Amino acid sequence: MFSKQDQIQGYDDALLAAINAEEQRQEDHIELIASENYTSKRVMQAQGSGLTNKYAEGYPGKRYYGGCEHVDKVEALAIERAKQLFGADYANVQPHSGSSANSEVYLALLQAGDTILGMSLAHGGHLTHGAKVSSSGKLYNAVQYGIDTRTGLIDYDEVERLAVEHKPKMIVAGFSAYSKTLDFPRFRQIADKVGALLFVDMAHVAGLVAAGLYPNPLPYADVVTTTTHKTLRGPRGGLILAKANEEIEKKLNAAVFPGAQGGPLMHVIAAKAVCFKEALEPGFKAYQQQVIDNAQAMAGVFIKRGYDVVSGGTDNHLFLVSLIRQGLTGKDADAALGRAHITVNKNAVPNDPQSPFVTSGLRIGTPAVTTRGFKVTQCTELAGWICDILDHLGDADVEANVARQVAALCADFPVYR
């Protein structure tokens, strides 16, 4: 028998030490990885609840196990809130991750060997949009579009040319490192021209979409996926959305269960329900606007300091800094910033001469720093510190000076009070 007083402390101190160290790192470091954020304690409470114990294969009202009457209510809440948040007619909250959701969309709507047209990983796309190392690039005939390297913008004429040439069964619109607004009507027009399905992966901008600060793809796409973390600020998980279409809905449900997954993670679905409720609150829009304001302020500092920002700026929560002109690598810059307790990620940029393990760029995002309370003033100052380190890459004195300022700023803006 277990006791409600059981704790990790005193039982598994090695594990507890690692957990505590990570939580302290989150407090002491400035987080600028675009895909990371901090969840509320409410989300954590739901995810750490007794729902962890319940197996519930199937869907609400159609389970393969008994005792699901309460978890049915949990999943129904998550579904209805997701539909309300994004104006969707259909929502599946069971995908374990964004990548799982994408794979399940392909499983539902494609056959092995079908052609898909997605954004190149090297130009800002995602692994699951047809990269050769991904199952999406192994199971399907993946054709890749990219950006115009002169402007940093998606070349929609090139997308259309490729679509006409290759006749894809599905066009994938979405990104992991693109700072401008996607033209969903143009994607829909191209898809209709060649008779393709349009699939939108809005994982990075879902929070902005929910707040009405980024175009909603639902009116244009046949199916939409997202993660529930990143800008949505919920637990790590996936979500599939669609307009009313009984045939597609049945295929999507069957692809998730039993096609790709067994029992859903009910504790995570509960945390998703909390996240969606938080995103429906009036203050969520103000948060998302601040995310954009902070990103634009930071990008402006880099431009003023002589660094190339891909696409010339940002419309959302992230931007890419190219270090090609400075002759620096993303790997070295990432490491130097880490020593100053600033966490970013190295990232490939257009025309990158370096390997994906080295790169010539940095991806910077503002969801996490905005959650801890940073405004434009703090983000402008922070961008200046990053430029100082890049201007004097490898200078231990500069890194130490920035680290001291980072420590003071983190103390003023704790993640959890």
Swiss-Prot record:
It catalyses: (6R)-5,10-methylene-5,6,7,8-tetrahydrofolate + glycine + H2O = (6S)-5,6,7,8-tetrahydrofolate + L-serine. (6S)-5,6,7,8-tetrahydrofolate binds at L121, G125, H126, L127, S355, P356, F357. Its cofactor is pyridoxal 5'-phosphate. InterPro entries: PyrdxlP-dep_Trfase (IPR015424), PyrdxlP-dep_Trfase_major (IPR015421), PyrdxlP-dep_Trfase_small (IPR015422), Ser_HO-MeTrfase (IPR001085), Ser_HO-MeTrfase-like (IPR049943), Ser_HO-MeTrfase_PLP_BS (IPR019798), SHMT-like_dom (IPR039429). It is an enzyme of class 2 (transferase). Its EC number is 2.1.2.1. Pathway: One-carbon metabolism; tetrahydrofolate interconversion; Amino-acid biosynthesis; glycine biosynthesis; glycine from L-serine: step 1/1. Its main location: cytoplasm. Pfam families: SHMT (PF00464). It is found in: Cytoplasm. One of its GO terms (cellular component) is cytosol. Keywords: Amino-acid biosynthesis, Cytoplasm, One-carbon metabolism, Pyridoxal phosphate, Transferase. One of its GO terms (biological process) is tetrahydrofolate interconversion. The modification N6-(pyridoxal phosphate)lysine is found at K230. GO terms for molecular function: glycine hydroxymethyltransferase activity; pyridoxal phosphate binding. The record marks H229 as: Plays an important role in substrate specificity. HAMAP family: SHMT. Belongs to the SHMT family. Catalyzes the reversible interconversion of serine and glycine with tetrahydrofolate (THF) serving as the one-carbon carrier. This reaction serves as the major source of one-carbon groups required for the biosynthesis of purines, thymidylate, methionine, and other important biomolecules. Also exhibits THF-independent aldolase activity toward beta-hydroxyamino acids, producing glycine and aldehydes, via a retro-aldol mechanism. Homodimer. This is Serine hydroxymethyltransferase 2. It comes from Pseudomonas fluorescens (strain ATCC BAA-477 / NRRL B-23932 / Pf-5).
